[in-house]
Amino acid sequence: MKKNHSLLFLMFIAISKLAAQNDSANKISTMTFQNVKTESISVGGTEFYYRKLGAHNPGIPVIFLNHLAATMDNCDPRIMDGIAKEHQIICFDNRGVGATKGKTPETIAEMAIDARTFIHALGYEKVDLLGFSLGGFISQEILLQEPQLIRKAILTGTGPAGGEGIKNVTKITYIDIIRGLFSFKDAKTYLFFNRNENGKRSAKEFLNRLNERRENRDKKMKIVNLQRQLKAIHAWGLQAAQDLSIIKQPVLVANGDNDRMVPCSNTYDLSKRIANSEIIVYKDAGHGGIFQYNEQFVRSALSFLAK
């Protein structure tokens, strides 16, 4: 009788463990950017907030650095979920952005230092970078400041220091914010997409995706920190060119062919100045070309990261 009880007990334990493993696997398979939890880590008195997808994937994580005025809620879910199928991908609010308190730095170099501090706080010694727009500026600085930290980088909708038209981002941003107020549209409709049928449709789809997350949304960007970001971008546009030939890592650069914010000429410039680079230019697309062509971009990004 005791043996029977012991066998039943062992079977119960085994079944419980199996059920727990299945439950854990199901949670992983259903985890998307729509429902992934927001975490935080304290570094030097600053509490950095972040979201991590694809944590079950082995290998080097991808750190996503986003655009001007962007909190974690401005990450495109299709790109985040797409990359997370094969890699761990982490987005975060840098200092003064969204839920992360403090003053946003007024230089790209300082923003890069903050990003590196965050990456090291998570315990990573090697990462891949995916930077869009302002995030692409920051990614370049990280590559130059601490090259040993980076395995590969993807630079999208971005340009080098002193690049063509970058000094005009502040003016373009304010104009399109005003356009948005008068038309009752999100300014990204104008900033990121062409004003033809393809662009308008892509803008609507993109903005709808940004609203898929209903609970535990991020805090809004404060105007004063938006202004500080714009000051940093303006300074980047006026800055002397950097020596990008010292970047030895594989780099993928991508943009739309009609980018009003960071003209596509900067994309070609990056690809020429970074020796080990590949380039993708999306036709009939603006600054948000990777959002308009999100499926194609994810395929290209995964292929690049897998090489």
Language model: regions and residue ranges:
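Conserved HGGG/HGGXW glycine-rich cap/lid loop of the alpha/beta-hydrolase fold
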Residues: 46-101
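Active-site loop/oxyanion-hole signature of alpha/beta-hydrolase fold enzymes
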Residues: 94-130
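Short glycine-enriched nucleophile-adjacent loop
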Residues: 136-147, 153
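Flexible "cap/lid" loop of the alpha/beta hydrolase fold
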Residues: 144, 152-182
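Conserved alpha/beta-hydrolase catalytic His-Asp/Glu region
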Residues: 186-230, 234-238, 243
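Short beta-strand/loop motif that positions the catalytic acidic residue
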Residues: 247, 253-255, 259
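Conserved alpha/beta-hydrolase "acid-adjacent" motif
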Residues: 260-266
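Catalytic histidine-centered segment of alpha/beta-hydrolase-like enzymes
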Residues: 285-298
